[in-house]
Amino acid sequence: IKETKGDIIIYVDDDALVDSNYIRIYAEHFAAHPDTMAAGGPIEPLYETSEPAWMSPYTKALLTAWMNYGDKVREYPKGRYPGGGNAAYRKEVFDRVGLFNTDLGRKGNLLLASEEKDIFDKMKALGMKVLYLPTPVLHHCIPHAKLEEDYFNRLTLQIGRSERMRTRAIS
């Protein structure tokens, strides 16, 4: 973040694909809406095999980061925020709220999370505008191994640990 030269920082997961107009969509939105401080878009799973029959919207969101709030620009529903793999920020956000808490992020085989939630909570506390944009779609590649019970158990346990660390830091 400190090394970036542009005014807009876009995050894309390393296991994802985006459409050819992805960057342009974010650039045009931020240019036309100077009050938008951050934005995110849909995250659609791209399965190596196929979506399992047991997948519910809840497990789909946990295992694949699936997110879709429709086809209109809007504020995120209460308690929701952009997925970290498909988010764009004005660089000045980090000057105002600080950098990501790297204790919360993924490292090696650890499935910790919530560093984005931490930033968005700080932004919300300052009244910064964060919008959902329906068109910068990210396709999150999901290997079969991420659909197995062992992975689900490790993921949910470590997300819980992350939330504990995050909420202890603000309480």
Residue map of PLM features:
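Short, flexible, basic/aromatic active-site loop/helix in glycosyltransferases
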Residues: 58-80
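A short, conserved alpha-helix in the catalytic core of glycosyltransferases
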Residues: 86-89, 93-97, 104-136
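The conserved acidic donor/metal-binding loop of glycosyltransferases
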Residues: 13-17
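Short aromatic/hydrophobic "clamp" motif used to bind/position activated sugar donors
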Residues: 9
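Catalytic core of nucleotide-sugar-dependent glycosyltransferases
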Residues: 125-129, 135-136, 148-171
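Conserved donor NDP-sugar-binding/catalytic core segment of glycosyltransferases
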Residues: 21-55
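Glycine-rich, basic loop-to-helix element that forms the pyrophosphate-binding segment
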Residues: 1-4
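An anion-binding catalytic pocket shared by soluble metabolic enzymes
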Residues: 82-83, 156
